[in-house]
From Swiss-Prot:
Protein name, per record: Dorsal root ganglia homeobox protein
One example of a Gene Ontology biological process annotation: detection of chemical stimulus
Tissues expressing this chain: Expressed in most sensory neurons but not in autonomic neurons. Also expressed in the dorsal horn of the spinal cord.
Main location: nucleus
Highest taxon in the source lineage: Eukaryota
Motif OAR boundaries: 204-217
Keyword list, A-Z: Developmental protein, DNA-binding, Homeobox, Nucleus, Transcription, Transcription regulation
Biased composition (Polar residues): 220-235
Species: Rattus norvegicus
Length: 263
């Protein structure tokens, strides 16, 4: 079994090659060197800004001349111009993003309308408008040469009050004259349709019929009371009716009556 071991170092020789420890220390310090933030004076900033206003990318000769003038190194001046260009690009980008919003006028914010407590909700209003529009369209389709057709007294389940009133006003405008709120002439003669409403007209007709019946009954009673008085008054002589037995026997002739006398 073999063992490998390092031979003893000779005195006066450098370990691990010909490099000295001083070389490693200088390289380590060079890598670990930290940058210090430069604090510019007011006069230095004014001179740098004046050159930046003329050109954003000064050449090396301009940077060296400026560095000698403000007592800085050319490297510091170059770094300042790099940072200043980055700041300028950021400012321009932010200004371009805000330009569309600045050009467009802000829309006026209008408060929502105050809804009355007793008014129907918006959903019911929209539904009522839709039903009114459908009713008007159906009425427009049923208009013929004889005039607008509208079923007499539509049931209340089909249209609500607002829709029914709008439909009636539309029919009145098409006809060109006033129209009853519940009874519309039916030119198609659809009398078999069930009638709804018209309570006032129906009540009036029933009352008129009852009054006519009462007048007729009174006239009949008056005529019945007048019959006995008219029968007692003198009149033409009534014709005598022969008895029942004489109707079967023929009347005797003249010769037969003379023969009976001679006998």
């Amino acid at each position: 079994m073999f063992y490998f071991h390092c031979p003893p170092q000779l005195e006066g020789t450098a370990p691990f090659g010909n490099h000295s420890t001083g070389d490693f220390d200088d390289g380590f310090l060079r890598r670990k060197q930290r940058r210090n933030r430069t604090t510019f004076a007011l006069q230095q900033l004014e001179a740098l800004e004046a050159v930046f206003a003329q050109t954003h990318y000064p050449d090396v000769f301009t940077r060296e001349e400026l560095a000698m003038k403000i007592n800085l190194t050319e490297a510091r001046v170059q770094v300042w111009f790099q940072n200043r260009r980055a700041k300028w690009r950021k400012t321009e980008r932010g200004a371009s993003d805000q330009e569309p919003g600045a050009k467009e006028p802000m829309a006026e914010v209008t408060p929502p309308p105050v809804r009355n407590i007793n008014s129907p909700p918006p959903g019911d209003q929209a539904r009522g408008k839709k039903e009114a529009l459908e009713a008007q369209q159906s009425l427009g389709r049923t208009v013929g040469p004889a005039g607008p057709f509208f079923p007499s007294c539509l049931p209340g389940t089909l249209l609500n009050t607002a829709t029914y009133a709008q439909a009636l006003s539309h029919v009145a405008s098409l006809k060109g004259g006033p129209l009853c709120s519940c009874c519309v002439p039916d030119p198609m003669g659809l009398s078999f349709l069930p009638t709804y409403g018209c309570q006032s007209n129906r009540t009036a007709s029933v009352a008129a019929l009852r009054m006519k019946a009462r007048e007729h009954s009174e006239a009949v009673l008056q005529s019945a009371n007048l019959l006995p008085s008219t029968s007692s008054s003198p009149g033409p002589a009534s014709k005598q009716v022969p008895p029942e037995g004489s109707q079967d026997k023929p009347s005797p002739t003249k010769e037969q009556s003379e023969g009976e006398k001679s006998v």
